[in-house]
Amino acid sequence: MDKKDMLYNKVMMLVAVMLPVCLCFAVPTETMAKKPKKLVILHTNDTHSTILPVSEHLPDTMKAGRGGFVRRVAMIKEERKRNPDLLYFDSGDFSQGSAYYTMFKGDVEIGLMNLMGLDAVTIGNHEFDSGLENMARLFRMANFPIVCANYDFTGTVCEDVVKPYVVLHRNGLKIGVFGLSPKMKGLVADKNCEGVKYLDPIATARKTAEVLKKKEKCDVVICVSHMGWADGKEYDANVIQGSRYIDLVLGGHTHTYMKHLEYVKDLDGHDVPVDQNGKHAIYVGRIVMNLK
C-alpha cells in the first residue's frame, strides 16, 4: 500500500467497568479496491500480571480502580460486538508483577488472554522470568500465535512455539504481523535464556518487513514490538529509521503512555506511526486504519 493513501484514527480506551472513556486521533493507510476498507486494531502492552484492577487508593484518580485482565476480557467482548473483524495484539510483558504470577507461573494470564481472541503476541523480557521450559509450556497453552523475529530459538524448547511473523486476513486485506523483542543481556538471567540467540532488530525488521510486503504480498505490515520508546540504539524509532515497508508499530517495554501517535520517518522518508499504552492494562489502544 502507498502510505499517502492511509488514514489512521487512534482512540485510547480507559479500562473501567465495561467500556471506557475514549480519545481520538488520525493517521494514513492504503487502498486495495474501489471501495474504502477499514481495519480496527486494539492493542495492549506491559500488563505485568495485573489480573484485578489496580488499587482504588491510587493518588491518580483516573487510574485508581481501573485496568486488569478481568475487566479487559469484558471490554473486548463488547468491542467485538461492534466490530467483529477487529484485530487485537499485545506487545509483551504480560507476565510478572503480582502474586498470581508468583504462584501459578503464568497460567492465569494465559487463561484470561485465551478469552480475548488475540491475533498475535510478542515476547517481553519478563516472559523469561520462570525459565525457558515454563515459557514454552505457556506458549503451548496459548490459543494465539507468539511472534518474535529477532530471537533465534533453534535447539531450545521454544523452537516450535514461536514464529517470526504471521499473515492475517481481514476485510479482503492481507496483514503481515511480526514481533521484535529487546536484548536479553541485563534484562534476563543467563540461565533463563540459555541457547537463545539475539539477532540485530534493525536488520531483522528490514528483512522481515520486505518479506511480508514483497513475498507474502501483504497490504499492511505491522510490527508488534517490545523494544521500547526512548533515545538509544535499539528502540522503535531506530528500527523504523533503518527499515522500510512497516506501516504501524505497536510498542511496549518502556511503559510509555502516548496521548497521541508518534511518527518516525523510515528509510524512504515515510512517516510511520508508533503507539504505546503505559502499563497494567489501564489503557487499551484502538486504531482505525481507513484504506481508501
Residues covered by each model-derived region:
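Alpha-helical transmembrane segments of integral membrane proteins
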Residues: 10-13, 37
